């Protein structure tokens, strides 16, 4: 563009990366310096959330968490309903991204969840006024990368500090930020920001409640790989006794769990189409509108498909569908055209910056190099406008 100005270069002796789950720069750092070597790959979940305004009085302080419905027994996740101030409710659905169904759609599952009589008693007759989506790091203790390297530290969700069974992580982000600040201060006083000096950050984390808490529940999420009932039994046993594996292993990248449509075990409850209305049950594009997301159409797309041909020859041919058109909670990806002219159309302006696509994309373009066929980079400008989320 004629008025284009390159971004400002900012130099620092130490940079603290706190970009949230699957941060663009944080993941580059992790892969470039092999910070996850000898540890499990990170496991993620996708959460979608709506704020609903009702006509009757609300239930401030209400907090409901559910497990399962409308998910199959092979999918880890559930819903929630929070009563906010006045006549507002926050309703959402969270699903582990290690599902095997190529047609699974979490936004659609949220609509089905809202149809349940238990949820309807709170939101019936209401209207959606806000929407958002985000991934969560669920891998736990064994998936935490080495959190330091020359001139850099990782904090919060970028490092994977989330306690899955307790649904807590904000206090870990705050504590890791405090410990990172202490480490940076010491490094600046010494005039040495090398990995040798910054390694004290990992020691501080190990002696804090952050890693102690995560170690206690280190095997909880992995137990649900076997299904909901075995997961509850094994996960609960390991969490309350502290027993179970003490070393990393047995965990695969989320995208490797996808299976052909006719082989997926989690399809039994994910085939029924959702029903929509003009208020509380909305389709995906309507939710995108309520997210407030905006991107200038004349900027370079921040989402690219590196090898579009492989979408047809590898992805659709193997899975019987285009998984990205389902797992994206913002309808960024559309399968258009017929026959040999079919292609994936990228509507980058819809993006709500959840990062699901780069985690769940089943095509690894260079075979296990952690470079997926979908490339997501921070846009020049724009994004969702979270309101009350």
Question: Where do the language-model regions lie?
Answer:
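Predominantly flavin-linked oxidoreductase catalytic cores and closely associated redox partners
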Residues: 1-124, 179, 183
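Flavin (FAD/FMN) cofactor-binding core of flavoprotein oxidoreductases
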Residues: 65, 121-142
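C-terminal catalytic lobe of FAD-dependent flavoproteins
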Residues: 92, 97-126, 142-175, 181-187, ...
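FAD-binding beta-loop-beta segment adjacent to the flavin cofactor pocket
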Residues: 133-164, 287-300, 310-327, 334
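Active-site-proximal substrate-binding core of FAD-dependent oxidoreductases
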Residues: 160-166, 178-230, 340-347, 370, ...
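C-terminal auxiliary extensions adjacent to catalytic cores
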Residues: 224-279
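Short Cys/His-rich Zn2+-coordinating modules
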Residues: 302-313, 337-343
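Iron-sulfur cluster-binding cysteine motifs and their immediate structural context
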Residues: 318-349, 355-381, 386
């Amino acid at each position: 563009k004629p008025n284009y100005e390159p971004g400002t270069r900012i130099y620092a002796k130490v940079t603290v990366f706190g970009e949230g789950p699957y941060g663009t720069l944080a993941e580059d750092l992790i892969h470039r310096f092999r910070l996850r070597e000898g540890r499990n790959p990170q496991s993620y979940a996708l959460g979608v959330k709506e704020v609903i305004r009702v006509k009757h009085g609300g239930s401030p302080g209400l907090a409901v968490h559910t497990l399962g419905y409308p998910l199959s027994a092979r999918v880890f996740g559930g819903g929630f309903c929070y009563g906010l101030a006045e006549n507002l409710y926050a309703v959402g659905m969270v699903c582990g991204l290690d599902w095997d169904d190529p047609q699974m759609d979490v936004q659609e599952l949220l609509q089905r969840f809202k149809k349940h009589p238990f949820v309807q008693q709170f939101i019936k007759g209401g209207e959606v006024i806000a929407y958002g989506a985000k991934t969560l790091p669920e891998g736990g203790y064994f998936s935490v990368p080495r959190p330091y390297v020359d001139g850099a530290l990782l904090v919060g969700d970028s490092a994977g500090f989330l306690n899955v069974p307790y649904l807590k992580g904000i206090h870990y982000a705050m504590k890791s930020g405090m410990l990172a600040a202490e480490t940076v201060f010491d490094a600046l006083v010494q005039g040495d920001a090398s990995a040798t000096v910054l390694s004290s950050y990992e020691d501080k984390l190990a002696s804090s409640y952050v890693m102690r808490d995560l170690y206690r529940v280190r095997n909880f999420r992995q137990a649900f790989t076997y299904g909901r009932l075995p997961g509850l039994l094994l996960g609960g046993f390991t969490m309350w006794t502290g027993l179970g594996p003490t070393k990393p292993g047995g965990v695969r990248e989320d995208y490797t769990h996808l299976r052909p449509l006719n082989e997926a075990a989690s399809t039994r409850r994910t085939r029924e189409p959702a029903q929509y209305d003009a208020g509380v049950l909305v389709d995906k594009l309507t939710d995108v509108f309520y997210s407030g997301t905006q991107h200038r159409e004349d900027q370079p797309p921040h989402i690219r498909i590196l090898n579009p041909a492989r979408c047809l020859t590898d992805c659709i041919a193997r899975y019987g569908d285009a998984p990205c058109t389902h797992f994206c909670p913002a309808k960024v990806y559309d399968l258009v055209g017929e026959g040999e002219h079919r292609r994936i159309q990228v509507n980058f302006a819809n993006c709500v910056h959840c990062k699901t696509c780069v985690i769940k994309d089943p095509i690894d373009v260079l075979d296990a190099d952690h470079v997926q066929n979908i490339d997501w980079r921070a846009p020049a400008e724009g994004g969702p406008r979270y309101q009350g989320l």
